[in-house]
Amino acid sequence: YLCGKCDFTYIDGCVELWHTRAEKDLDLTEYLGLTKEEYQIFLAQGNRALKDILDSQRVFRRFCIYQLCLGETQTVPFAFKQLDALRKAGYEQPPAAAYQTVWSAEVCCPKGQNDMEVLGRLFLDFNEHLPEDYRGRPLAPSDVVELDCQGKRTYFYVNDCRDFAPVRFSPFLCKRLPEPAQKQE
């Protein structure tokens, strides 16, 4: 719930499942991943009180994904490569005019989760479970991810699934993906 992967009502199903488990190796507090204090409030005051506590422990962060515009006629020497290839190609920072904005959304995170943890999660999410209306490629080296933390925007060059290098980036120079063609009736 803290990561936004399920609705709060999912907890009821988890409690039911715990009661029917053959193994009794975990108490309900451990099974739900709650602290003793959270569990006591859950028992004494119910779901609403627990939801309020958990809601106070999470935050929504805006992010954008920028990917290189790749065509059949142009070659980008650092496409799908790490930051050192970008520098070998003569760039100090990713050339924003060669990129397009492919996605902008919010991600739910536990408060206190650092940028690298958020980026690692986005890398997995945008490789394993692409949103239905996502029109970019899976996240890969040479992509740029923007994270917004309370109005402060930070940009990261994707080196690989665990390595994201802070970079300067000018998103207003990026191209927008063309709107999808309307279906003919």
Locate each region found by the language model.
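Non-Sec secretion/translocation targeting segments of pathogen effectors
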Residues: 180-185
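Short, conserved turn/kink motifs that form compact alpha/beta structural patches or helix kinks used as
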Residues: 91-92, 96-149
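Amphipathic alpha-helical packing elements
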Residues: 2-57
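Short, compact, well-ordered microdomains
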Residues: 31, 39-53, 138-173
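Extended boundary segments
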Residues: 59-113
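Short, surface-exposed beta-strand/loop "edge" segments at domain boundaries and coil↔beta transitions
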Residues: 9-10, 17, 21, 70-78, ...
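Charged, low-complexity intrinsically disordered segments
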Residues: 10, 33, 40, 68-70, ...
